Amino acid sequence: MVELAAIAVHLFAILCISVSAEIELPDKRAQFDDSFLPYYPSSAFMDSDEAIVAVPSSKPGRYYFDQVGLDAENAMSAREKRGFGDEMSMPGVLRFGKRGMPGVLRFGKRENEKKAVPGVLRFGKRGDVPGVLRFGKRSDMPGVLRFGKRSMPGVLRFGRR
């Protein structure tokens, strides 16, 4: 009964929000006569002067998300860049562990330089077969990922029964 009341309250809230979202566009923007435009706020349509002011840019023609961070990175020496991932972060780079390179995702121990293969993500023990991701105990059947004591093909188990 409580779930039914919660669903009814949420539906009523969605209905109220959708009704209140219908606003009239000013005459300045009335040149767009499509049926979907009254559902968008007038702030969604900017003049060209407003658009230029709204986008911060320090270099012409390009938009940098974190210009201060990029300037600091470019000013650093090669020695300082080696430990760059320890103190600072860059947008769009996902780092695990101490050091990270853009486009490289590392978990656990560092791979040996002799056997490091680009595009291979390793977890736990090293697998003999390329393209096989191994967790926990070794499986005798291909395509079976085993967790715990018993496992069935196609069943992934975590924790207790």
Curated annotation (Swiss-Prot):
TM region(s), chain numbering: none
Predominant location category: secreted
Family: Belongs to the FARP (FMRFamide related peptide) family.
Protein name listed in UniProt: FMRFamide-like neuropeptides
Disulphide connectivity of cysteines: none
GO biological process: neuropeptide signaling pathway
Signal peptide interval: 1-21
Positions of the propeptide segment: 22-80, 111-113
Subcellular localization(s) per the UniProt record: Secreted
GO cellular component, one term: extracellular region
Keywords for the protein's UniProt record, in alphabetical order: Amidation, Cleavage on pair of basic residues, Neuropeptide, Repeat, Secreted, Signal
Presence of keyword Signal: yes
Keyword Transit peptide recorded: no
Phenylalanine amide: residues carrying this PTM: 96, 107, 123, 135, 147, 158
